[in-house]
Amino acid sequence: HHPQWQRAKAWLEAGEIGTLRHVDAAFTFHLTDLENIRNRPDAGGGSLRDIGVYTFGSARFVTASEPVDLSARLILENGVDTFAQVAGIMEGPHGRFTYGSMTSMRLYNRQVVTFQGDKGMIRVEGGPFNANVNDMAEVELHQNGNRVITERFPTANHYVLQVEAFGRSIREGVAYPCPLEFVKGTQAMMDTVYNVGVEISL
């Protein structure tokens, strides 16, 4: 619902970065309190369930693509994944491209998604998954080695926009931008990652 994602999607669809080749996403924060719901296996904790939905969903939304091959490496603590590194291939209207993501509940705060093409790059940062909380929401378009267009959204509140979009769907019959079917696709991607994930240790 946040306009930064709408802008990234529009730039990609307009061919601003040429042919899409790779998407990379990272979402991390530091949380060691084992009583926190995110660290409890009985409450469905884990970095993937808590924040992997964002790294998966953002790539799927902007590119309108689905994974066709996935692998994952997981670090487990107390029965939950505190670190997950996912790699794969996605396919959709922009063709096939590689995908990589990293989520962790044991690293310093970081949120960024990049969409790399053969002629440019789109970078969504400034805390894009909880925009304007950690930093100002912004999206960048990099082209020609030294040209950068930056758009910032200091006042956009994606929670308000979500409620407004829902209201329009009810009152006017306008299509909801993130329907249940889309959410099911993100859950399917997560299920696959857990099925193919390999536990590693440091």
Predicted regions located by residue number:
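A short glycine-threonine-serine/GTX helix/turn-capping micro-motif
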Residues: 43-49, 149-157
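Predominantly a Rossmann-like dinucleotide-binding segment in NAD(P)-dependent oxidoreductases
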Residues: 2-71
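C-terminal helix-rich "cap/oligomerization" subdomain common to oxidoreductases
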Residues: 151, 165-202
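Contiguous beta-strand/loop segments that form the cofactor/metal-binding neighborhood of enzyme cores
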Residues: 56-131, 160-175, 191
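Short polybasic amphipathic segments
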Residues: 113, 131-144
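Short alpha-helical
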Residues: 2-3, 158, 185
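Residue-level signal for the nucleotide or nucleotide-sugar donor/cofactor binding architecture
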Residues: 3, 161, 178
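Short coil/turn segments
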Residues: 28, 127-129, 154-158
